[in-house]
Amino acid sequence: MKIACLLGQGFEDSEFRVPYDRLLEEGYQVDVIGVKAGEELTGYKGKEKAKTEKAIDGVRADDYDALLIPGGQSPDHLRADKRVIDFVRAFDASGKLVAAVCHGPQLLAAAHLVKGRTLTAWSTVQDDLKQMGANVVDEEVVRDRNWITSRKPDDLLAFSSAIIDSLEGSDEAPAPRKGDNTAAHP
C-alpha cells in the first residue's frame, strides 16, 4: 500500500517523523509530496529534515491508498497552493483514508470539506473549524467516515495506531504496542 504524505516547510517534527516511521515499520510505502520534488524541508523545531520525493503536480489521488497531513506550519504554507487543495479534495472524494494531525486539518478547511464533519485539531485551529461548520471535539483521536484526526504530538502514538488499524481494516481501538509510551493516553 502507498501512502501520500503532504509536507511543506516548518512541519511539526514529531508529527511527521512518528507516523512516517510507524508506517514504514509496518511495511507501507510513504511518498513525501510537496510543491516541488527534491525540496529540502526542515521541521520548525529544526530536529527533522525531509526531502520531497514527488511534486504535487506529478501525483494523483488514485496513485495512493491513504493521505497523511502532519501539522506545524506546513499546512499553512501548502494551503496557498491550489494544486494541493485539489489533491486533498480528490482524496476525500475517493473515500480513501485521510489522516490529519494538529494544524493538518487546515488543509481540509481550505478545501471546504469540514462543514458537517466531526474532527479535532490543535486548540488554536479548533475555533476556525467550528466557524466553518465542523463539529469539533477535544479528543486524542477522532474518526469520521474516511477521516482520522488528532490534536497534538502527545496523541501521536494513538494517531499512528489508528491509521494502521484503518489501513488493515480494523475498527477496534488499537492496543498499545510493547515499548509504546502510553503515559499520554487516559
Please provide the spans of the model-predicted regions.
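Catalytic nucleophile serine of serine hydrolases
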Residues: 102
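Extended, subdomain-level signal for the structured scaffold at the beginning of enzyme domains
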Residues: 1-94, 98, 107-118, 126-186
